[in-house]
Amino acid sequence: MKIQIKTKEESRNAINRLGLNTVPEIFIEKHETDKMRQFMDTYKEELYVLRDADRSSSHYEYISSYEECVEKAKHFKGRVILAVSINTYKEKLLLGAIEIKGDVVRLCATENKALDHRTMYGGAEYNFETDIFDKNLSKIPELDFLYGYIVEHQLFDITVEFTIYDKCVGTKNERIIINEIRNY
């Protein structure tokens, strides 16, 4: 499957179109406080994340209340993404990004619960490129589960940013969250 993704919104739309499991989130204008309240009333969690909807690797804020959301949103320039934070779900087993292109596997992943998708690149235990026949891949916890998910959903030739948990979570109530798919 050849998917072209240039933005976070295109990634989110593709994730939804492909029926992948993700966290609840909305793309809104920073002044749409009624939509913020409705989202937080619908998805009552301990922790949310607010981030720029139009720029990757941009500033983000963790928030825990509607009032805090409204206040922090004022500091963003335009559209924002309000999402349930993946940190709400406890017991991450493996977090990372993987791309399988032909026989080539590119993987950056960690079991370190202190790392996230932005900080893992500097401290991930698994950060390499190899082929799918490399026997060392079988030593990585949950990689068989991840590979099965990629095959089931035909997520080849694209980077898949994921988090795997010890229990079912997210919009589809599965053990894996797909945080982003990208080729930008």
Please give the residue ranges for each predicted region.
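Nucleotide/phosphate-binding sheet-loop regions of phosphoryl- and nucleotidyl-transfer enzymes
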Residues: M1-Y184
